[in-house]
């Protein structure tokens, strides 16, 4: 038995699916409670399990999808972050959309980075970084670090991240962890967006895992990515940007599986938008650099 949970901007839905019989056993819906996600998640889980009349031990896998990340970015409700930009002039990164991604949040620009061959272009001033981090620590919840050509040599990103973690204990996104592509300014923007989402998606995952554990469900929790594939909860805690369009992707994959059709047009309608998709092309979206 499979349990699917989708936390959207308005409702949290749950479904029990019997894979062996290819049958939907029960569905349930509960309002998404943004002030405390546990209320909506628990409500949906309790309702669907009551309707399905099953034991918690019968659930073998839990699949979680959500539009919380998408909505947070669209509505500008991501958490406050700081960007650490190494080896780039500010105007270069600005052209990639840094101002739009950061808003009023701070950015630290440092000399450093590497050349295309992986050799250091300039030394990295870690003492200055430490001073800057201390000055802005109270204003942010996470950091995003991007260094020039870090995909060829991540040394400066790793060193900067170590300083930030030691001083703050807060989450740090490294751009070379998100992509192997060379466009550093766009990697910087993607790293910023990822950092904005960390606490949001981490909160959802932790809430869901706790709700399941309280009800005796010991099945692994997997999360739907924006391309429809499943990844571990630990993975999306560090890379929540991978859940962009998670909800619509789950709708598309689910519709294709339930109907068994090779070609179909699927409509995904919610409070904020309507999406039309073709079943032979699973949703593929990334902020530039999620495409390897």
Report residues per predicted region.
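N-terminally biased helix-coil "hinge/interface" segments that flank
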Residues: 1-275, 284
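Single conserved hydrophobic/aromatic residue that forms the stacking wall/gate
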Residues: 276-292
């Amino acid at each position: 038995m499979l349990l699917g949970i989708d936390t959207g901007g308005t409702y949290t839905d749950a479904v029990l699916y019997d894979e062996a019989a290819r049958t939907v056993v029960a569905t349930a819906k509960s309002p998404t409670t943004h002030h405390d996600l546990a209320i909506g998640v628990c409500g949906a889980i309790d309702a669907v399990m009551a309707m399905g009349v099953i034991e918690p031990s019968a659930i073998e896998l839990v699949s979680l999808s959500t539009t919380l990340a998408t909505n947070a970015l669209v509505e500008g409700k991501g958490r406050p972050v700081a960007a650490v930009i190494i080896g780039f002039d500010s105007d270069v990164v600005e052209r990639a959309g840094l101002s739009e991604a950061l808003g009023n949040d701070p950015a630290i620009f440092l000399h450093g980075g590497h050349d295309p061959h992986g050799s250091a272009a300039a030394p990295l001033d870690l003492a200055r970084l430490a001073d800057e981090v201390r000055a802005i620590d109270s204003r942010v919840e996470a950091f995003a670090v991007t260094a020039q050509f870090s995909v060829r040599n991540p040394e400066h990103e790793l060193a900067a991240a170590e300083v930030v973690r030691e001083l703050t204990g807060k989450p740090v996104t490294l751009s070379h962890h998100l992509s192997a592509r060379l466009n550093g300014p766009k990697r910087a923007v993607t790293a910023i967006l990822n950092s904005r989402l960390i606490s949001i998606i981490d909160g959802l995952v932790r809430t869901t895992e706790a709700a399941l554990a309280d009800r005796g469900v010991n099945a692994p929790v997997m999360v739907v990515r924006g391309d429809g594939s499943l990844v571990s909860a630990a993975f999306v805690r560090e890379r929540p940007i991978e859940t962009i369009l998670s909800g619509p992707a789950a709708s598309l994959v689910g519709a294709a599986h339930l109907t068994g059709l090779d070609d179909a047009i699927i409509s995904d309608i919610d409070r904020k938008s309507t999406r039309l998709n073709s079943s032979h092309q699973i949703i593929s979206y990334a902020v530039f650099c999620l495409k390897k």
